């Protein structure tokens, strides 16, 4: 599914990743652990296509395609989901509106019919019940006024709705209380199957 070959990356002239090789196959959950500043988040951002990094050498092959040639939107549409360590707040945009737009964009890219409002809300209800989330999550502005734990729960909610082939959790367990961590762990369990894979970036062993 994902294979990183001889990857070297620098930021502002400083080498962060040197000659990295990594393989993630279907059905696997791979954890990458290390202290702050060791390049963990750099790796997740490079896979997702975030700007600001220079790839000096190497390839990132996802489903037999070198995704370094794709922009971030194409990488997401091809089945890569990055749950951010610090999810962005967007006041004025409802969580449900953002999610439906993102979901239907991916469906359209892959040649599938877009979900109508009814089908979308039914799916939201099923997923939110799995995670024990309050109905108000959908109507609130995207991450605006959310606590740190609520933002992380929302990332997991979006992950289960989007159904990506590869999910990257970038220190999503950082700063969470026990109850929030339980919801994250349940989300990971619901997501896991033999058809997808997960890359977990963390410096804790608890998740």
Roles of regions detected by a PLM:
Residues 24-26:
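Conserved hydrophobic segment flanking the Walker A/P-loop of ABC-type ATPase nucleotide-binding domains
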Residues 159-160:
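ABC ATPase C-loop
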Residues 171-172, 179:
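Walker B catalytic motif
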Residues 201-203:
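H-loop/switch region of ABC-family ATPase nucleotide-binding domains
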